[in-house]
A protein has these predicted regions:
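A domain-start/cap signature at the N-terminus of enzymes
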Residues: 17-52, 78, 135-159, 163-165, ...
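The feature captures the conserved acid-bearing segment of alpha/beta-hydrolase catalytic domains
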Residues: 156-236, 242-248
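Active-site-adjacent mobile loop/cap segments within catalytic or ligand-binding domains
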Residues: 251-269
Length: 374
């Protein structure tokens, strides 16, 4: 009985501390009462806009699991961002597991839940809607890919911990703007590319980064930096790989945890980096228009339009002002060369009416840009 009393006192103390910091909120969505934990930083003011950060738990987990391994409240106070830990809804096709992406035939889609939640929060608080960020662990990270692919008009940047892209995402992803993304992946993570009965379920880390670097039109080769091995007892080291100079000056970053597993570095596994700190440092540099600080693009939008028009298009693209005979390539987001041709000086036209709708990379000599086929 004495031990029970001690446990109860401890439980209520922890619960009280938690409740004093977080606001447990509910919202009715798609006929279900959905929960989320909301943290308003001490530095919040109604007189200025604050960024918004979503932090998504892993599959079968709950908000408090993610808060335990990724408690960003101090960061939120220091940097004046509003923090949200949403709760996934039980998946009836997976024994009631709390999954962000439900299995089997389902019309459940949490992309719309987050879309509604952004609108709900922005109606209550002074939120900078150009600086809405997302990070997540495991299945929560897979959901971050979904947000970047399908809700990119509202998500400025994202970070994925312990998950590569699903094959279905790789095949269908279509962001609407240059998209900064960072991953923190262990080389021994079982999600480093998965096949089942000859079918690819998750692509590899290299394929994941290739997709985003090609989409963002970054430098082909990354800068590699070995992070100091400050904890020699954690069984792992970290290599930072940085692809720079993407469109709108966005970048792609990988923290490759050599010897690391399915973990959140700084909480478990590798202790050479603190994932929370690295996440905020990365995403906070961007808004939906790209790098927030001065970005010296090689071509302005006006200059791009003077060369390639119309863009987007359903059929004909006109290429103007070519001073030299050039090699032209059209490349899809998987890196496949769809067209290779030589074009003459002056004005040329391309007919892309037979192409599938989506985003392509047009390269002419040393110049490259995205074209959108409607």
């Amino acid at each position: 009985m004495f031990h029970l009393k001690i446990y109860l006192v401890f439980f209520f103390l922890v619960s009280s501390l938690f409740s004093q910091n977080f606001i447990n909120q509910t919202i009715l969505f798609d006929g279900n009462e959905r929960e989320y934990e909301l943290y308003i930083p001490s530095s919040y003011s109604e007189n200025s806009l604050s960024p918004l950060m979503f932090n998504f738990h892993g599959g079968s987990d709950f908000t408090y699991d993610q808060i335990q391994q990724s408690d960003m409240r101090d960061l939120a106070d220091e940097n004046n961002f509003i923090l949200v830990y949403p709760q996934a809804h039980p998946d009836p096709n997976d024994g009631g597991s709390t999954n962000w992406i439900h299995k089997g035939d389902t019309d459940h889609d949490d992309i719309y839940f987050i879309d509604v939640l952004i609108s709900e929060l922005s109606a209550q608080y002074q939120i900078d809607l150009e600086r809405v960020y997302a990070c997540g662990y495991s299945l929560g990270g897979e959901f971050v890919y979904e947000l970047l692919c399908r809700l990119s008009n509202k998500i400025a940047a994202g970070v994925v911990v312990a998950r590569t892209m699903g094959q279905y995402q790789y095949e269908t992803c279509s962001p609407q703007h240059p998209t900064p993304i960072m991953t923190i992946l262990g080389t021994e993570d079982f999600y480093e590319g998965i096949e089942y009965m000859g079918e690819v379920i998750y692509i590899s880390a290299d394929e994941t980064h290739q997709f985003w670097t090609e989409y963002n039109n970054t430098n082909y080769n990354p800068i590699e930096i070995e992070i100091s091995d400050v904890n020699t007892n954690d069984g792992s080291t970290v290599t930072k790989r940085l692809w720079e100079n993407g469109d709108a000056c966005v970048s792609v970053v990988e923290y490759r945890v050599n010897g690391g597993g399915h973990e959140w570095p700084g909480y478990n596994g590798n202790m050479d980096i603190n994932s929370d700190n690295e996440i905020w440092e990365f995403v906070s540099a961007f808004n939906v228009d790209g790098l927030i600080s001065d970005c010296n693009l090689s071509l302005t939008n006006e200059e791009q339009n003077s060369i390639i028009s119309p863009n987007p298009t359903r059929s004909i693209i006109t290429i103007n002002n070519l001073s030299d005979k050039s090699i032209l390539n059209i490349i899809d987001l998987k890196g496949n060369i769809i067209l290779e041709s030589t074009i003459e000086t002056g004005k040329s036209q391309l007919n892309i009416s037979e192409y599938s709708p989506g985003i392509y990379i047009l390269k002419i000599g040393g110049y490259s840009t995205k074209i959108i086929k409607k």
